[in-house]
């Protein structure tokens, strides 16, 4: 069973045009998932231009100082602050978006999405971070993501959803497209957790989608991959294929990538609690199916060269 469609997703985000300069990249290395993590500069630094690199490639290791870092927006990212759903309506906030050092992350740094609630709408903050270029279509989407099975603080039991998904910029688009990884450690909508839902959408309203569920605890780091080529979408977790969709359940227009951490409902009050989701890095290769091994080899090469950001995907 997949989630009910996330309705009333209002957006007020703009596409940023970025200059490009030459950046020499070291050769890719097939070594282990490691690398040096340079500290991000302060929020007052000047935003750097887009480096060049392998064609049709997006990579970000999330080396930013915070949600107000000018390089975050210059690199085409936006932290959501508008209204609407999914989850607890009108609770989207930049407060939960951070980029702390993390010894468990490749390169020693990750993006943290921390949602919090005390069981009331007024005491709830959800977090979502997305690209704004609307230029990602077919190809390979990959991200190293840390899921949480229990809150970082407070009582367990919330129906939290930790997600990675490419999606159309408008829910009402005639060519609506959405491809979901959704982890529900405690279940939701009447289902029992833990569960990882993969969902391919054709239409948002009325909902028209296909899905498959993996019932397994996934606390920790995982490599999530979506390959959308040749009229087929394949979802994989740590190199294992989970689900394939085809026919009308494939991308039909260019999308943005989103990461979000949100609550389905508020099942109880009685004290604050926080839930963490982390993203080590994100990678996209346009129009090509890339294996897990080659994705990791390319990412290792970026880290080895000290390259934290690449975007050579043609603009819309």
What are these model-derived regions, one by one?
Residues 25-157, 162, 280-316:
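Low-complexity, Ser/Thr/Pro/Gly-rich disordered linker/stalk regions
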Residues 162-200:
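Glycan-recognition/cleft segments
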Residues 248-277:
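Flexible glycan-contacting loops in extracellular carbohydrate-active proteins
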């Amino acid at each position: 069973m997949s989630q009910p469609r996330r309705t009333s997703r209002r957006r007020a985000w703009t596409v940023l045009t970025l200059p490009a300069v030459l950046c020499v990249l070291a050769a890719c290395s097939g070594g282990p998932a490691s690398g040096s993590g340079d500290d991000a500069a302060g929020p007052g630094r000047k935003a750097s231009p887009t480096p060049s690199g392998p064609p049709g490639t997006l990579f970000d290791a999330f080396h930013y100082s915070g949600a107000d870092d000018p390089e975050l927006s210059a690199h085409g990212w936006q932290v959501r602050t508008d209204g609407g759903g999914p989850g607890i309506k009108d609770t989207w906030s930049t407060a939960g978006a951070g980029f702390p050092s993390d010894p468990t992350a490749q390169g020693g740094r990750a993006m943290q999405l921390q949602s919090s609630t005390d069981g009331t709408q007024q005491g709830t903050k959800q977090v979502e971070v997305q690209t704004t270029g609307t230029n990602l279509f077919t190809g390979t989407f990959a991200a190293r993501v840390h899921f949480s099975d229990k809150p970082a603080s407070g009582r367990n039991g919330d129906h939290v959803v930790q997600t990675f998904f490419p999606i159309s910029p408008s829910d009402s688009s005639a060519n609506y497209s959405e491809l979901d990884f959704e982890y529900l450690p405690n279940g939701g909508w009447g289902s029992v957790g833990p569960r990882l839902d993969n969902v391919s959408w054709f239409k948002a309203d009325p909902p028209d989608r296909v899905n498959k569920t993996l019932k397994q605890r996934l606390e920790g780091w995982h490599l999530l991959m979506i390959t959308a080529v040749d009229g087929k979408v394949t979802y994989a977790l740590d190199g294992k294929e989970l689900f394939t969709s085809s026919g009308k359940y494939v991308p039909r227009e260019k999308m943005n990538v989103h990461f979000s951490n949100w609550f389905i409902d508020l099942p109880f009050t009685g004290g604050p609690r926080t839930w963490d989701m982390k993203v080590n890095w994100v990678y996209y290769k346009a129009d090509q199916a890339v294996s897990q091994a080659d994705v990791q080899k390319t990412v290792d090469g970026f880290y080895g060269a000290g390259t934290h950001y690449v975007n050579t995907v043609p603009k819309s």
